[in-house]
């Protein structure tokens, strides 16, 4: 088992109202999707150019992981997401390899996809 491909890059932003036009100019197309992920207290905008996807994440609560990330580090790259065939098997493989998982079970993220986050200290992040 292995990671299949880069699924997207997640970027924490203070305001989608400000960041969406910036990334539209940068990438050359508007976001193809905006979605509220209530469980994570974020609103996301997705951009795509070819096979490359960028997810912008704006916090909807000061308690969200994105709000805390921005408070501590400022806006910027929050995560790199990889596609996998079997998320539970991949979580087990990563755990056995010494990575610290932030959730013990997959949870729903944007696009209703199952996700699992690794602790940044496990990945030099």
Segments and roles (model prediction):
Residues 1-20, 75-84:
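N-terminal beta-strand motif that seeds the catalytic metal site of vicinal oxygen chelate
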Residues 5-7, 17, 27-30, 51:
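The feature marks the first
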Residues 25-32, 99-102:
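Short Pro/Gly-enriched beta-strand edge/turn motifs at strand-loop
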Residues 30-71, 111-125:
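Conserved short beta-strand elements that form part of the metal-binding/catalytic scaffold
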Residues 2, 45-46, 82, 91-125:
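Vicinal oxygen chelate
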Residues 19-24, 47, 94:
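Conserved active-site tyrosine of GNAT-family acetyltransferases
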Residues 73-74, 87-92:
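Long, charged/polar, surface-exposed segments that mediate recognition or autoinhibition
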């Amino acid at each position: 088992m292995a990671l299949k491909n880069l699924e997207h890059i997640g970027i924490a932003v203070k305001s989608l109202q400000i960041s969406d036009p910036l990334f539209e100019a940068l990438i050359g197309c508007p976001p193809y999707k905006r979605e509220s992920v209530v469980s994570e207290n974020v609103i996301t905008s997705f951009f795509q150019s070819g096979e490359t996807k960028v997810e912008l994440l704006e916090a909807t609560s000061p308690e969200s992981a994105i709000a805390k990330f921005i408070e501590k580090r400022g806006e910027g790259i929050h995560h790199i997401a990889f596609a996998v065939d079997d998320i539970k098997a991949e979580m087990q493989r990563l755990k056995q390899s010494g990575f610290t998982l932030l959730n013990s079970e997959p949870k729903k993220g944007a696009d209703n996809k199952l996700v699992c986050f690794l602790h940044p200290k496990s990945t030099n992040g």
